[in-house]
């Protein structure tokens, strides 16, 4: 099998050989530009001293580029029809393991321990994520505290904008905070829709997430912190007070007391959630947690 998978001609040849038909339900769009693959591996910072988990290898175009540079690659593929294709296209590489399964249901830490011969090496996660499942996968990896020092994803540009957003912009929201609380986020480059087969309706972007040594702000209860941030963006055009009072009805009889307490730490309830940065949300959630516990 030729190593140059990521061209229109080679991709078409592989798909015809196996009679492969794209499943819209799985959001399958295969890259057909090897230059983009090189930029992804460069952005991810892959070396022979790193292990890589890839999610959704497709027919192996990105996988082979990762294998050329990394120590070992473990790729999660949910579509069983692609397994024999991957066996064929990646047969020249002995440092790739393909795991058939849904990464959302997988014990990723167990896979790391079992599949990598040198599991102590730094781990990087790289993926061309299906649009429909982008957010659940990223949040699972963060929630499960997978020991990856960075994650590099190609995803819908709109989602990349939301992940890398700053306060007081239309893209800034609870997803921004959920990710930037743990990771530094950089939108690396835009990927035009024309370099995919089949061609999607929108452009993509590659985003690079680097794990922070410590979360961006100190919170007393992370679960409550994220509950507060989600509530604050429930209706973007409403004030903090309206959104929080809707989520926590116990605040309503004590509004004056709450306003006074929050003003003392520099937070005005007439602001909208989109104007608060992460440290301010941390102050807000820590205060609210104590306030709601008071008799």
Curated annotation (Swiss-Prot):
S-adenosyl-L-methionine binds at residues 29, 31, 56, 77, 102, 128. The keyword Ion transport does not apply. Its EC number is 2.1.1.182. One of its GO terms (molecular function) is 16S rRNA (adenine(1518)-N(6)/adenine(1519)-N(6))-dimethyltransferase activity. One of its GO terms (cellular component) is cytosol. CDD domains: AdoMet_MTases (cd02440). It catalyses: adenosine(1518)/adenosine(1519) in 16S rRNA + 4 S-adenosyl-L-methionine = N(6)-dimethyladenosine(1518)/N(6)-dimethyladenosine(1519) in 16S rRNA + 4 S-adenosyl-L-homocysteine + 4 H(+). Keywords: Cytoplasm, Methyltransferase, RNA-binding, rRNA processing, S-adenosyl-L-methionine, Transferase. InterPro entries: KsgA/Erm (IPR001737), rRNA_Ade_diMease-like_C (IPR023165), rRNA_Ade_Mease_Trfase_CS (IPR020596), rRNA_Ade_methylase_Trfase_N (IPR020598), rRNA_adenine_dimethylase (IPR011530), SAM-dependent_MTases_sf (IPR029063). It is found in: Cytoplasm. Pfam families: RrnaAD (PF00398). Belongs to the class I-like SAM-binding methyltransferase superfamily. rRNA adenine N(6)-methyltransferase family. RsmA subfamily. Specifically dimethylates two adjacent adenosines (A1518 and A1519) in the loop of a conserved hairpin near the 3'-end of 16S rRNA in the 30S particle. May play a critical role in biogenesis of 30S subunits. This is Ribosomal RNA small subunit methyltransferase A. It comes from Listeria welshimeri serovar 6b (strain ATCC 35897 / DSM 20650 / CCUG 15529 / CIP 8149 / NCTC 11857 / SLCC 5334 / V8).
